[in-house]
Amino acid sequence: MAPTGLLVAGASFLAFRGLHWGLRRLPTPESAARDRWQWWNLCVSLAHSLLSGTGALLGLSLYPQMAADPIHGHPRWALVLVAVSVGYFLADGADLLWNQTLGKTWDLLCHHLVVVSCLSTAVLSGHYVGFSMVSLLLELNSACLHLRKLLLLSRQAPSLAFSVTSWASLATLALFRLVPLGWMSLWLFRQHHQVPLALVTLGGIGLVTVGIMSIILGIRILVNDVLQSRPHPPSPGHEKTRGTRTRRDNGPVTSNSSTLSLKD
């Protein structure tokens, strides 16, 4: 499956880059006119999260053997979904490198590097696909996070839609991010004798990295959206740090990444 998986990942890379190109040809909300690149990037990320997160949830529901045997038990199409996600993270990483400064995106790039390394193991070996499918459940929470950022970008906070999205982000963070991360950590600990040491190390680093980022992000959303009377615009001390860099096609671009921010 390795050659097919690589072809799928390559096609996915081109498809998500093409989607970004197509979104640039569509009207951008007037309120997000100053942050058009960020709007396009978030829309592409939302599309991937909905596709991969929903696919992982349906797949694990229809084929529970993927959770029972995360190493060997999986249908053929599950590996295709994992390869699609590899292509997306490579495309998003290229987009970040092209449009934002390294100082503003190093955390996201490190996150993407770890994720691509882990998912690529399943694509190249044909094993650990069930484990990868469980990890894609995190994208259900990512979909809420991307929608929340889009609402912030379009100046829809505070609003009922933003409040619902904030609560949904916290709920899915617990259910579809922290729970799967805990399950994967426990499985890796119990089955470490069946997994090569290099993969145990890689998986452990990935789980710790994403886990820390997830907890910090959850605390920030809880404080900014729930405990405070109203959400504040992004600032250096909050979830996002804004800076500008000249985009290669036209006009300035506003970056939206800060230390330990999360976008998967």
UniProtKB/Swiss-Prot annotation:
<feature type="compositionally biased region" description="Polar residues">
    <location>
        <begin position="252"/>
        <end position="264"/>
    </location>
</feature>
<feature type="compositionally biased region" description="Basic and acidic residues">
    <location>
        <begin position="237"/>
        <end position="250"/>
    </location>
</feature>
<protein>
    <recommendedName>
        <fullName>TLC domain-containing protein 2</fullName>
    </recommendedName>
</protein>
<feature type="transmembrane region" description="Helical">
    <location>
        <begin position="199"/>
        <end position="219"/>
    </location>
</feature>
<comment type="similarity">
    <text>Belongs to the TLCD family.</text>
</comment>
<dbReference type="InterPro" id="IPR050846">
    <property type="entry name" value="TLCD"/>
</dbReference>
<feature type="region of interest" description="Disordered">
    <location>
        <begin position="230"/>
        <end position="264"/>
    </location>
</feature>
<comment type="function">
    <text>Regulates the composition and fluidity of the plasma membrane. Inhibits the incorporation of membrane-fluidizing phospholipids containing omega-3 long-chain polyunsaturated fatty acids (LCPUFA) and thereby promotes membrane rigidity. Does not appear to have any effect on LCPUFA synthesis.</text>
</comment>
<feature type="domain" description="TLC">
    <location>
        <begin position="34"/>
        <end position="227"/>
    </location>
</feature>
<dbReference type="GO" id="GO:0055091">
    <property type="term" value="P:phospholipid homeostasis"/>
</dbReference>
<dbReference type="GO" id="GO:0071709">
    <property type="term" value="P:membrane assembly"/>
</dbReference>
<keyword id="KW-1133">Transmembrane helix</keyword>
<dbReference type="InterPro" id="IPR006634">
    <property type="entry name" value="TLC-dom"/>
</dbReference>
<keyword id="KW-0812">Transmembrane</keyword>
<dbReference type="GO" id="GO:0007009">
    <property type="term" value="P:plasma membrane organization"/>
</dbReference>
<feature type="transmembrane region" description="Helical">
    <location>
        <begin position="114"/>
        <end position="134"/>
    </location>
</feature>
<keyword id="KW-0472">Membrane</keyword>
<feature type="transmembrane region" description="Helical">
    <location>
        <begin position="42"/>
        <end position="62"/>
    </location>
</feature>
<keyword id="KW-1003">Cell membrane</keyword>
<dbReference type="GO" id="GO:0097035">
    <property type="term" value="P:regulation of membrane lipid distribution"/>
</dbReference>
<feature type="transmembrane region" description="Helical">
    <location>
        <begin position="3"/>
        <end position="23"/>
    </location>
</feature>
<dbReference type="Pfam" id="PF03798">
    <property type="entry name" value="TRAM_LAG1_CLN8"/>
</dbReference>
<dbReference type="GO" id="GO:0005886">
    <property type="term" value="C:plasma membrane"/>
</dbReference>
<feature type="transmembrane region" description="Helical">
    <location>
        <begin position="77"/>
        <end position="97"/>
    </location>
</feature>
<feature type="transmembrane region" description="Helical">
    <location>
        <begin position="169"/>
        <end position="189"/>
    </location>
</feature>
